[in-house]
Structure formats: C-alpha cells, structure tokens
Curated annotation (Swiss-Prot):
Its EC number is 2.7.7.6. This is DNA-directed RNA polymerase subunit beta'. It comes from Burkholderia mallei (strain NCTC 10247). GO terms for cellular component: DNA-directed RNA polymerase complex. Zn(2+) 2 binds at residues 819, 893, 900, 903. InterPro entries: DNA-dir_RpoC_beta_prime (IPR045867), DNA-dir_RpoC_beta_prime_bact (IPR012754), RNA_pol_asu (IPR000722), RNA_pol_N (IPR006592), RNA_pol_Rpb1_1 (IPR007080), RNA_pol_Rpb1_3 (IPR007066), RNA_pol_Rpb1_3_sf (IPR042102), RNA_pol_Rpb1_4 (IPR007083). Zn(2+) 1 binds at residues 70, 72, 85, 88. Its cofactor is Mg(2+); Zn(2+). Mg(2+) binds at residues 460, 462, 464. Binds 1 Mg(2+) ion per subunit.
Length: 1412
C-alpha cells in the first residue's frame, strides 16, 4: 500500500543551490528547452474546447490537459504513465507540466531583441559602436549598412540610403556587401573579434587624453569584456528562434455564454505567428523585395511588442483599445512578478478583524474570537480529533468542526494553549508592527488588544483592523515565542526607549493620583504603613492628593552577594508624600526606590520610570510593573472622574488690553507707511511681528491664569497652588493636548497662512470659546484643508523613502563578533549656539570604545578599548567630565559583506550587544522611515516673518570657566583699543578647571571681543558683540587710503539717503554699465605708508589690496588716514538673497540621495594661501597657492559671499565661499568621518525639530551603504578598468589576491552614491531588478552573465530560501559546513578505494549535491 501511495506522491526533491546566474540564451539553447514548434496561431477549438494541434495550446507540445489522460482518450489512468499516444501524440503525464514545458517559433527572418536595442544605453549600439538611430534605421528597413567594403573606398558599418546603395552598386558592382534588417546587424555582430577589440580599446585608453573619449572607451570596454568573460556571443542579441511561454502561464479560460477571457500574451504570440507564417509563404513564392521587406519589418515590430509593448512606436492594442500587456510588463512595476508575487505573497492560516481594547489582558496576551481561532487552527483540531478517536477520518473530523460540537471547543482550548499567534497592523513601518501573543479565546468577533502595545503598533480603536497569522512549525513557534512575544519587545529599536509607555487615560489617572494639594482632607497625618493609608482612604478620612507622612517598605538590592543570600532585602523609611503616591508604592518592583514615584507622574516621568525599571530590575519585573501601572492608571482615572466643560477654558482677563495695544501699534506703522517712512515690505514684516508677539503674550497670560489657583492653607492664609483645572491637567500630564491647542481654545488663534505659505497680516483675535465670525472661519479653512492634503502626500512620500532605505540596506547583516579594527570616530557632545543639543552620554551609550577611556585626573584606564559602554559607564564618563570618546562605528567596520557586532554596539531593541545574524540594515531603514510621516513636507521661506528668530548680535557664556580661542581665531586692536575679529572661522571655547571644553561659540568676522584668551569668567558674561545688520570690511594694516577702480557711474554709484541727506558710495555690478574696458576691474583699496609707498603684506612682496564686493557701502574717503581695525566699508546683510531652507521629509530624502545642492558652498581643494586673481565677466577669480607653490584657481560668481581674504591661510576642505555644503566635496576633501558627521547631524536636525529620537548608528549604517562602492584610480594588475565603480568588498578581495600573487593592487577613491543609485548598483541583480528599472537591470545582467550569490535578504525571499539573517544565517552556515565535510569524506573514500585496488587514482568526479 505504502509503495502505491509513494507512486502518487512523487515528491520532487527541491534543488539546493547557492547562486543564480542569468545570461543570454543561444538559439540552440532555446530549441533545447522547447518541446516542439508552434506553427499555427490557433488556440483552442471553440466548439469542442480542445486545443488545436500545433497551435498555441497544443497538447502534443505542452502536455495533457487532464492528469494522466491523452487528448483523444485512448490512454487513461496511471498505469500508462509516460506512454505517448500514437493517435494524438500526447504524452500521458501530469497536467501541471503545462506550466513548465516551453515551445518555440522558428523565425523566418532574424529579429533584434528590443531590450538590447532600446534599453539605454543601447547594448547593440555599444558593441557595434554605432548610434542607436543608425541601428534602428537598418533594423526597420530604412537604410543599408555596409558589411564588407571589399576593395571600395566605403567603410564597414557605413549607413546609406536606398538611393545611395543603388548608385554605389552601379559604381562598384558586387565588390562590396551591404544589407538591411536584422540579418545585416547579425552579420556585423558575427564579424566582431572581441579579444582584438578589447586589446585595442585598452591601448587606446592608455594613450588618449580627452575626457569624453576615455568615458566612451571605458563604457564600450566594459560591455565587450563582459561578453568576453561570460562566453556569450554578441549575435545572440538577435533572435532566430522565439521561445513560447508554457500555456498555463498565459491561460485562456472559457466564460459562460461562449466568450473567453485570455491573457494578452496569446494575442501578441498570435500576431507573431501570423506574420511569421506569411513571411515564410512570401519567401517561398519569391515575392518582390519590397513586399518581403515590409513583412520582415512587421515581424520585427510584432516581436518587439511581445517582448516589450510600447517601448518603440505606438503600443499594440487589443479589441478594447487598451495597450496589451507584454512580457516586460509582466515583471516590472508594483503589479509585476517581483513586487506582487515574489516579495508580496499572501499567506495561509491568517485572518483579520477589527480590534477592540482588552484592558484585562496581560501584556503577552491577545483576545482571539472563538470563530476565528476555530478556522485558523482547523488542521490541528482535525489531528487532535483523530488522535482522541472522536472522529475516524478527516472527513468526519471536518463535520464535527462544522457542527461546532462541545468537544470541539474543548479541543480548541487545548490546541491553542502555549501556541502563540502573530498580530500585524498595516502599515508595518518597523519591526514592532508584527508581534506575537498568546491567544485567549473570547466571545464576539473582534480581536482584543492590550492597550500598552498600541504605541508600537500605532493602533487606536476607532475602527482599525489587524491581521492574525499562525506560526505552524515548532521552530516557527519557538521563534515567535522567544523573539517576537510582545513582552520581549519592550524597547523601540530606533532609540532604545520603552515602547510600552502608558498614554492618555492611564497617564491622566497616574498624574491625578500623584499630584499634591494644599490643605487636603487629613493633611499632616502620619501612618505606620501603606495598608493603613488605604484603609483611611477607603473610609474617606483622607483625599488622594493630601500630604501625609508614611512609613514605606522598599526592597533594595542586597549588599551581601554570597551564596543563598536573598537578592533583595526590605528597608523601611519614613517619607513625606501624598496618599495617592503611597498607595501606588504597592506596585513598585523590588530594586526600585520609592523616590521614583514620589513626584507628580507626567508622561515623560513615567517613560523614565519604566526605563529605569528595565535597566535596574530586568525585563520580567518591568513588564509586570507596566501592566500594574496600566491597571492602576485606568482605575484611578475612572475614580477621578475628570471631565471638561466650556468654563474650564479660562480666557485671560488681560486679553482685551494686549490686543488693543497691538492694534494701536499696527495703526502707527500704517501711518508711517502712508507718510513714506517705511516700505511696504517693512510695514508688513513689522505688522506680522507685532501680531505673532501678541499671540504669544495672550497665550502666556492665559497659561499663567490657567496653571495656578488660589487656595486657603492650613493656617488660614491665602496662597496659590498648581491648578486642578481639567484642561490644564490634561496638557500638563502629557495625556492630551498642548499649550498651543489650549491657546486656540482660550487665548487667540493668531496668524493664519495663505495657500502659498505667506502669512495673512490680519490675525484671528478670537478663540474657539468666544467663537469665530464668518471671515475668521473662512480664513482658517485654508490651513485645515492644506493639512489634510499634506498628510496624504506625506504618507506616500514617507513610504517611498522607507522603501528606498530598506532596499539600500537590506543585505547588511551582523556576520561576526569582531572585525578587529582599531578605527572609530571621536564623539563629542553636540553643541549649537552654546546650547547642548545632545549630550555626550546619549551619543556613546551602547557603543563599543575604540580606544581606552582614561580618567583625565588620574590618567588611569577606566574602560579598555573593546568595552561596551553601558549606563554605568556613561554616567562615570559624564561625572568625570570627559568630553571626547572614540567609539567604534559601522562606518569603519572592516567586515566584508556585512558588519561585526563590536562596530555596531548595542541592539537598542534588546538592550544588550547585538547578536550575530541581526539584520541591522533593515532595522536602520525602518527606524529612519517609520517617523517619516511625522515630518513636515514644507520648505521654509526665510524672509517675511514666518519663523524668523531674532537675529543674534552677541554671544554670552552659559557656564563659569576660562575663555580659550581656537587656532583659527585672529584679531587686531583698533585705535579705541577694542579687539576686532578678522578671522572667518574663529571660535571661542569655555573650558573648566581641568581644561575640558564646556561650550563653544562661533565668533563672526568684524565682531568686537569683550573677553580675551585666558580670561576667567562667570556664566552670563558677554564674550563678543557685533552689528547684526551689516557685515564690515576691516583693514588689518594702517596707512593712507588709495582708491583703485573706484569710478562713479562705472563701479560705484552715489546714493543719497532720503532722510538724512548724506551721500555714500555703493559698489555696483560692472556689467550694468556698458564700458567694455571696465569688465575686469574691481573696486579696491591700497594703503600707502608715510613715504607714499604701497604697504606690503609682511614677509611677502604682495601689496595689500582690499577688494569691495558688489553692494558694499564704502565708508572711507580717498586719501583718508586709517588705523588698524578700522572699517572701510559695510555690506548690508538684508541685501543678501534669502535662502529657502528645505525642511522635513524632502530634506531627509535630499541628504540620503546625496544630491549636490545648487549654489553649493566651495571648499578649498588644497591647503595654502589665498589671493585674488584677475576678474572675468561676472566672476571673481580666487587663487590658492599650495605649499609646493602650485596654483589652484576657482571662479566665483560676484554675488557670492567669499569667506576668506587676501593672504589668509586655509586648510584643505575649509569653506571658502558661503553656501550649503556639498556632501561629495566633504567626502573628497575631508574624508569619511567628516561626511558621516555632516549627514548624521543634518538628518538629526530635521528629526529633532519634530521631537523624534533616532539613534545615530542607524544613520551611520545608511551612510556605510551609500559608501559601499569605490572608484578605481589606478587598476594595477587587477581586472578592473580605471574610472570603473566597483563594490568595495569586491575590490578588497581582488587586492588581497593580487598581494598574495605579488602583483600590483588597485588604488581607489571613495565615492558617495545616493540611496536609489546605491540600490540599483548592488551586486545582486535580483535585488536591483525588484527595486526599480527592472528591464534595464536585467538587460545589463544578462549581457554580463551575472551571478547572484544570494547574499542579501531580498534575493533569498524572492527565490524562496531562508533569509541569511537570524536563525537563517546559522542554518546556511551549518549547511555549507556539512556540504564541505561531505565533499571531503567523498574525496577520502575515493582515494582509499583507489589505493586499495592499487590503481593510479583516477580524478574523483565532483559529486552532485547529495540529496538532503
């Protein structure tokens, strides 16, 4: 019996493979795949529904329609398996072979494959070195191409029109050969000698000098070398045989009523066959050339449409005027094979339903409706029923289940016990979007979800749905339980904060319970323990918020760590606290002191509390604690009965007067404008400023009034306490609402924006409590609608960004423990404008030290290199005031094809060092993409008053210490004895007693220094002041002013101030005035000494020249005596172009796409001395002379702000012209560390503005992937071409090989690729093709004969293997090790056998993979 069953089963052993190769198929290969030629365009007989013979669905070619049954019905049943029927020619076998058997069409005339012709850059064009336009003219029979010029003056590959051709034939007879159509192109391809071409190209490359030629040759060389290496012949790009897809993959299904639904491919194939057959007939009839030619062209077009419809010319359309879906359309795009079927499979054993809240569940549970569970666990129930003998067959078991008999429910309970299910809420933006829970059976039809996991799922209960999936195998259940159980995922992988933080009601309840009130009932009582407090509270002797004294028992860690000693010991102390806090102390986990609860618990505090619990008490205690906090919070919020009413929105009493004052000021500005004292723009700016200040003032007054309330204390005196106003409590606790929203309810709504983003100058002075009038309502509708439109856009954009990020990092997995590198980056606290934006502890927490951390006072090593810096370590480092720590980073990790655990550091979602096999790339992408929807979509316009901060005009110290200047700080002392700064990049540091940097401030050019280097100062001391509205030009030398090229009406114009009547000279742009001679001149000042000689720069022969840029107001006169540090001219800063600052999501995308900004700042290419050369039209010439004396020139537009001056020494990579930085320049001139710092800081700025926390390491991981390719500078003896971009690990492998063979390794430059570019240029063609530009990627891969080693996650998902991450990584490693040992054993046995027989050992054949 068993043998018979096995006959039925015939399980196909699936192949085990480690790589997939793609290549061009030769005509013979196509024929070898085929099971017969399709000769007729017929599909099926419309009466009998049987396939036509030799047609597109022919059973003889493709196999039988019914299992084990031939077409005519002569042979049926299994016993005839493998017989070929002599009547109908059909093999008796399974019908599913119709999914895998291919046919072919012999083309009467060769046809070019459109992918290799039209997919840019055209591969055919590259190989033939002809333009695409010319090849197309030949292929579509518009022109001839010379194949063999013979003895004529014609050139090979020359294109000629028909007329030309006939003339030449008359002239030369048959001395030469020219052809048209694909035959001609095929001849040309066959005639190419690849090896020879490669040699010539390599020599050409060495000898040519022109950039364009180098580029062209390198491109062509790459394609030809690919052909050479892969053994693919170029003429295979021209098809002689067309393969036909198996019929089940292009089905034809009869609908009722005699109509048929068919795949578009059948139409396309029919066209090809019809035209092919017609062409065959015409050729047999020896029809006139012109007719045959037309038919060949039509055949070419038909094949084009089949392969890629619409790529050339108009798309072929079906009966309904809709373009037909070709083979290319089947695989590309969102609905194509890759993204729809290979990456997005639907799964069995799943269901979805609405979610409702389940406050009684434990954190690791979810409520599963009985009916759903019954359906999901059906097979398990069937099995149990059979085992228990309730049902004899599966059919009987099925009946039992359908009737839902009582025994079924008991069995369901049993089956479900300890069997986790996975819940998923779409969109799954990060790994916490799928978590495992233990199901609890419930009545009803909705899934119950624990409230604390809502934050991770981003779920709410307004109708959200969730999907349930059942892990089937034991391994899957185990992984779900250990890795995915909700109680094991309590931290966000993005930043390491707890994800199970209470919100809304829970927060409100806990806040209310831990507030204190003055003179509450029972204030000042003392209690002996918490149980007494609870009794008093239940008997209404005390209120929740009353201040009382209580003896509280805390469990503290035992000092005695000996064997058998308890871990925690009780400690009793008296606390002054409130009733609510004392009651809450009951749920404190052992190891946490009561002090963490002895304060009003706001949302931030609760988050910190859970974090502390996790670090001090471990995962288990924390989960229990969080659950209990939630229960208490809900209970207390219910008991508190907090509600809001209109009267809670207190409108501030001062509102009328504040608004009235503002209106008066606005009137005053209107008057000034009417009398012409201010411009329209100034008036508008001022009005907007006034109203935004007013809005703030009203809001402040409102919050002051709302936040406190009068109360009588125990002594009978009136005092104020924090308010118990419901609205204030909600906002203050962080449960709901914010100051801004309360301001709209009870203050004033303030200014509104127009559709284009500009601000309407009349504000809405009303608030929602008073109500809006029609105009106010109308003004505010715009903002509301724009918000909705923005949200929709944002979601799509954010999703696309996430997709690109995942694609670029998907193959980055932790593959080893330590790569052993000593490199790292120096981490400092992030300081902006003297404020610490991000403390050092946050930046190094969870990283591995790259060098020893040394105590600056005692010089002893605190932490050795290679130590993981945890909370205690960073606290030590902070306490000792160490201000810089070198840590390992993903950027400098030397692991190839992955990362090592030490360079990555702590896995933030688990709180310990990352495990080998963790897919850190995907986690990084999710962490950056997930908050994307919270970012704004807007571009900020600076100018107008949108978000103008007051312009800074001084800096002051924030802490006590000593002033220190950086090396680049230079200043001169002027006649008044003031120190004037003349450096552009000088900074002042404040250091503490041991000399550690506490803060750092940029001091701009032209500032007056109030404190000098080494001065001891107190916090709040001003360090420097400057005029914020103008930028001065200052002389560093004294002397007599001598103007050069200052001609009124040519380079300067006289401006007379309307109000004061004084005149000043303004430098104007020369090109506005006609005189040609004045083009190269630039107004400047030279200084003369007492003898009338030009003052020289000390130590050189250069005369001092101080140039004025366009727009400068010259404040000195010709011949005037000036002192050192005196101002020669001022440039009003208002006249500088207002820069748009790209914010939000577009900015993040711009950084990761590594786009060069327009008007980028210019960085110095070398270290050297600056001088100014001769100006050209509209440009100024800046020259840097390096230390060897070579000159490097930069041409800079006149209106740009140059940050350096004559004679200044600049360092390589220093900014010399103002503007946004170009990341490519930073990488080239300052290196990887500077680049990473730039991208990390810029991305963090955007997220920080929205209050989103992301750990730096995620951004570093992305930057590592952006840097994964290098450009070859000198190829040494390697197989690369200079200028080629290759994968870094490839190049390092190749260089290792060269060094081992004593050959010259290649040298290279780092290059930065944007994430889209990096994803497409990955080594894996499967991953690239499934990302974007599918056709182009596949075309290129096919020509190169590329091999995909299946290293990344995506490729493995697509081919259906376990992914090489997590447990899958271990699986693949073990499998490879086993294969290796099998191979060695096989060799050993073969050798032993050979030895025994005493024969000379024959070479052992390579074993095929042993069936596993």
């Amino acid at each position: 019996m068993k043998a018979l069953l096995d006959l039925f089963k015939q399980v196909q052993q699936e192949e085990i493979f480690d790589a997939i190769k793609i290549g061009l198929a030769s005509p013979d290969k196509i024929r070898s795949w085929s099971f017969g030629e399709v000769k007729k365009p017929e599909t099926i007989n419309y009466r009998t529904f049987k396939p036509e013979r030799d047609g597109l669905f022919c059973a003889k070619i493709f196999g039988p329609i019914k299992d084990y049954e031939c077409l005519c019905g002569k042979y049926k049943r299994l016993k005839h398996r493998g017989v070929i029927c002599e009547k109908c020619g059909v093999e008796v076998t399974l019908a599913k072979v119709r999914r895998e058997r291919m046919g072919h069409i012999e083309l009467a005339s060769p046809v070019a494959h459109i992918w290799f012709l039209k997919s840019l850059p055209s591969r055919l064009g590259m190989v033939l070195d002809m333009t695409l336009r010319d090849i197309e003219r030949v292929l579509y029979f518009e022109a001839y191409v010379v194949i063999d010029p013979g003895m004529t003056p014609l050139k090979a590959r020359q294109i000629m029109t028909e007329e030309d051709y006939y003339n030449k034939v008359e002239e030369y007879g048959d001395e030469f050969r020219a052809e048209m159509g694909a035959e001609g192109v095929r001849e040309l391809l066959r005639s190419i000698n690849i090896d020879e071409q490669v040699e010539t190209l390599r020599t050409e490359l060495k000898n040519t000098g022109s950039e364009a030629k180098i580029k062209k040759y390198a491109k062509r060389l790459k394609v030809l070398e690919a052909f050479q290496r892969s053994g693919i012949k170029p003429d295979w790009m021209i098809l002689e045989v067309l393969p036909v897809l198996p019929p089940e993959l292009r089905p034809l299904v009869p609908l009722d009523g005699g109509r048929f639904a068919t795949s578009d491919l059948n139409d396309l194939y029919r066209r090809v066959i019809n035209r092919n057959n017609r062409l065959k007939r015409l050729l047999e009839l020896k029809a006139p050339e012109i007719i045959v030619r037309n038919e060949k062209r039509m055949l070419q077009e038909a094949v084009d449409s089949l392969l890629d419809n619409g790529r050339r010319g108009k798309a072929m359309t079906g009966a309904n005027k809709r373009p037909l879906k070709s083979l290319a359309d089947m695989i590309k795009g969102k609905g194509g094979r890759f993204r729809q079927n290979l990456l997005g499979k639907r799964v069995d054993y799943s269901g979805r339903s609405v979610i409702v809240v389940g406050p009684t569940l434990k954190l690791h549970q979810c409520g599963l409706p009985k009916l759903m569970a019954l359906e999901l666990f059906k097979p398990f129930i069937f099995n149990k029923l059979e085992v228990m003998g309730v049902a004899t067959t599966i059919k009987a078991a099925k009946k039992e289940v359908e009737n839902q008999t009582p025994v079924v429910w008991d069995i369901l309970e049993e089956v479900i016990r300890e069997h986790p299910v996975m819940l998923n809420r779409a969109p799954t933006l990060h790994r916490l979007g799928i978590q495992a829970f233990e199901p609890v059976l419930i009545e009803g039809k909705a899934i119950q979800l624990h409230p604390l996991v809502c934050a991770a799922f981003n779920a709410d209960f307004d109708g959200d749905q969730m999907a349930v999936h059942v892990p089937l195998s034991l391994e899957a259940q185990m992984e779900a339980r250990t890795l995915m159980l909700a109680s094991n995922n309590v931290l966000f992988p993005a930043n390491g904060d707890p994800s199970i933080v209470p919100s809304q009601d829970i927060v409100l309840g806990l806040y209310y319970a831990t507030r204190e009130a003055i003179n509450g009932k029972g204030e000042g009582l003392s209690f002996t323990g918490v149980s007494e407090v609870i009794r008093a509270y239940e008997n209404k002797e005390v209120e929740l918020a009353s201040r009382v004294n209580v003896r509280i028992t805390e469990m503290v860690r035992n000092e005695d760590t000996s064997e058998g000693a308890p871990q925690f010991v009780p400690k009793i102390s008296l606390y002054a606290t409130t009733v609510g806090r004392a009651i809450l102390s009951e749920i404190l986990p052992p190891g946490l002191p009561f002090s963490v609860l002895n304060k009003p618990l706001k949302k931030k505090e609760i988050s910190r509390l859970i974090n502390t619990a996790f670090r001090k008490c471990g995962l288990r205690a924390t989960v229990v604690f969080a659950d209990q906090l939630m229960q208490s919070g809900f209970r207390l919020a219910t008991r508190a009965g907090i509600s809001i009413c209109v009267d809670d929105m207190l409108v501030p009493t001062q509102k009328e007067t504040i608004v009235g004052d503002a209106a008066k000021k606005v009137k005053e500005y209107d008057r000034q404008y009417m009398s012409g004292l201010v411009t329209a723009q100034e008036r508008y700016n001022n009005v907007v400023d006034i109203w935004s200040a007013t809005s703030e003032a009203v809001g402040k007054a409102m919050m002051e009034q709302l936040s406190t309330e009068p109360v009588i204390d125990r002594g009978g005196n009136e005092t104020r306490q924090e308010s118990f106003n419901s609205i204030y409590m909600m906002a203050d606790s962080g449960a709901r609402g914010s100051a801004v929203q309360i301001r709209q309810l009870a203050g004033m709504r303030g200014l509104m924006a127009k559709p284009d983003g500009s601000i309407i100058e009349t504000p809405i002075t009303a608030n929602f409590r008073e109500g809006l009038n029609v105009l106010q309502y109308f003004i505010s509708t715009h903002g509301a609608r724009k918000g909705l439109a923005d949200t929709a856009l944002k979601t799509a954009n954010s999703g696309y960004l996430t997709r690109r990020l995942v694609d670029v990092t998907q193959d980055l997995v932790v593959v080893e423990d330590d790569c052993g590198t000593s490199n790292g980056v120096a981490m400092k606290a992030l300081v902006e404008g003297g404020e610490v934006v991000e403390a050092l502890r946050d930046r190094i927490l969870g990283r591995v030290a790259a060098s020893d951390v040394v105590n600056p006072e005692t010089q002893e090593t605190l932490y050795e290199a290679g130590a993981l810096l945890d909370e205690t370590a960073v606290e030590d480092i902070e306490r000792l005031g160490i201000d810089e720590v070198r840590v390992r980073t993903a950027l400098t990790c030397e692991t190839r094809y992955g990362l090592c655990a030490s360079c990555y550091g702590r896995d933030l979602g688990r709180g310990s060092l990352v495990n080998v096999g963790e897919a850190v790339g995907v986690i990084a992408a999710q962490s950056i993409g997930e908050p994307g929807t919270q970012l704004t979509m807007r571009t900020f316009h600076i100018g107008g008053a949108a978000s103008r901060a007051a312009v800074a005009s001084s800096v002051e110290a924030k802490s006590n210490g000593t002033v220190r200047f950086t090396a680049s700080m230079r200043y001169v002392t002027n006649a008044k004895g003031e120190q004037i700064v003349i450096s552009r990049s000088g900074e002042a540091l404040i250091t503490d007693d041991i000399g550690r940097e506490r803060e750092r401030h940029k001091i701009p050019y032209g500032a007056t220094l109030l404190q000098l280097d080494g001065a001891a100062i107190k916090a709040g001391t001003q360090l420097a002041t400057w005029d914020p509205l103008t930028r001065p030009i200052i002389t560093e030398y004294g002397g007599t002013v001598k103007f050069e090229n200052v001609e009124e009406g040519v380079t300067v114009a006289k401006q007379i101030d309307d109000v004061t009547g004084l005149s000043t000279l303004v430098v104007i742009d020369v090109k506005r005035r006609g005189s040609q001679a004045a083009k190269s001149v630039r107004p400047q000042v030279k200084l003369l000494d007492a003898n009338g000689d030009e003052v020289k720069i000390p130590g050189t022969e250069h005369a001092v020249q101080i140039g004025f840029q366009v727009g400068a107001l010259i404040t000195v006169k010709d011949g005037q005596q000036v002192q050192v540090g005196e101002v020669l001219a001022r440039i009003p800063t208002e006249s500088q172009k207002t820069r748009d600052i790209t914010g939000g999501l577009p900015r993040v995308a711009e950084l990761f796409e590594a786009r060069s900004p327009k008007d980028a700042g210019i960085l110095a290419e070398v270290t050297g001395t600056v001088s100014f050369g001769k100006d050209t039209k509209g440009k100024q010439r800046l020259v840097i002379t390096d230390l060897e004396g070579n000159q490097h020139e930069f041409l800079i537009a006149k209106e740009k702000q140059v940050l350096v001056h004559d004679g200044q020494v600049v360092n390589k990579g220093e900014m010399i012209v103002d503007g946004p930085a170009d990341p490519h320049d930073i990488l080239r001139l300052q290196g990887i560390e500077a680049l990473s710092r730039y991208i990390v800081d810029e991305v963090q700025d955007v997220y920080r503005l929205q209050g989103v926390k992301i750990n730096d390491k995620h951004i570093e991981v992305i930057v590592r992937q952006m840097l994964r390719r290098v450009q070859i500078v000198d190829n040494g003896d390697t197989r690369f071409i200079p200028g080629e971009q290759v994968e870094r690990s490839d190049m390092l492998d190749e260089n290792d090989r060269m060094i081992a063979e004593d050959k010259r390794p290649a040298t290279y430059d780092n290059i930065l690729l944007g994430i889209t570019k990096a994803s497409l240029s990955t080594d894996s063609f499967i991953s690239a093709a499934s990302f974007q530009e599918t056709i182009r990627v596949l075309t290129e891969a096919a020509i190169m004969g590329k091999r995909d080693d299946l290293r990344g996650l995506k490729e493995n998902v697509i081919v259906g293997r376990l992914i090489p991450a997590g447990t899958g990584l271990a699986f693949h490693k073990a499998r490879k090790a086993k294969e290796q040992s099998d191979r060695e054993r096989f060799d050993q046995i073969a050798a032993e056998e050979a030895f025994e027989f005493g024969t000379p050992s024959a070479p052992a054949e390579e074993p095929q993979h042993p069936a596993e």
